[in-house]
A protein has these predicted regions:
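Short, structural beta-strand-to-alpha-helix junction motif
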Residues: 30-31, 72, 172
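Short, charged, amphipathic alpha-helices and their helix-cap/turn boundaries
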Residues: 4-13, 68-80
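An N-terminal domain-cap segment
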Residues: 1-50
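C-terminal end-helix/capping segment
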Residues: 55-71
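Structured surface interface patches that mediate subunit assembly and partner/cofactor docking
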Residues: 3, 18, 44-59, 75, ...
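Short, contiguous, pocket-lining structural segments
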Residues: 3-7, 26-30, 65-68, 93-97, ...
């Protein structure tokens, strides 16, 4: 199994354990809503573009709500577990397109629960998450009012984005991934608390 496939399996296990009505970090979404989002993304090519294109978002939201309401919970989870259908572009590019998606949404489920702790990630998962961080950071934080350096606790610079006063954000790769994706529930240290607040307010979520 690839790192993306293992993360998918872990997400499915967590969703199965906590059920369809638990909160997530995605504002207004329960685990059922999040599961429907993942199913629509991979299986409804007519509706998936609205996830990224605001002009089409209304139709996507309608399809997602219908999917959440009309599909049995176990069926939703099974569809996530089985992965993209044969003709889906996500099937061909699963390792690239789904690693971050599965990790971020798994943590959206985990970290909405009280008492969460970061998971210990294996080397393959860390490497798979590390590759797209820079591209994601440019997408979500390119216009933040600070020159942000993302670095690991070992001092490795992962990405530098934005312009303005310097801000160093330090954390493990998984935590940096979540921060870049717009999540505040991440274990990080910031060199400047005021700049960090401004960056949080200005970044785009995924």
């Amino acid at each position: 199994m690839t790192a993306a496939q293992r993360e998918r399996a872990a997400l499915v296990a967590t969703m199965s354990e906590i059920g369809p009505d638990s909160p997530t970090l995605c504002e207004g979404w329960t685990t059922r809503d999040l599961a429907a989002h993942l199913v629509v993304r991979e299986r409804r090519l007519d509706a998936a573009p609205g996830i990224a294109i605001p002009l089409l978002a209304g139709y996507t939201d309608k399809v997602q709500r219908r999917t959440a309401a009309s599909t049995d919970w176990d069926e939703l989870v099974d569809k996530i577990s089985s992965g993209p259908p044969l003709l889906s572009p996500f099937k061909l590019f699963d390792a690239v397109a789904n690693m971050d998606e599965m990790f971020i949404h798994h943590e959206d489920v985990r970290r909405a629960q009280p008492g969460w702790e970061p998971r210990s990630l294996d080397a393959e998962t860390i490497a798979a998450l590390r590759r797209p961080v820079g591209m994601m950071a440019r997408l979500t934080m390119g216009k933040v009012p600070a020159r942000v350096t993302l670095q690991t606790p070992e001092g490795e610079t992962v990405a530098v984005v934005g312009s303005g006063p310097g801000l160093t954000v330090t954390g493990d790769i998984g935590e940096l991934t979540l921060f870049v994706a717009g999540r505040d529930e991440a274990r990080l240290t910031f060199s400047d608390a005021q700049a960090a607040q401004a960056v949080r307010a200005a970044r785009r979520g995924l």
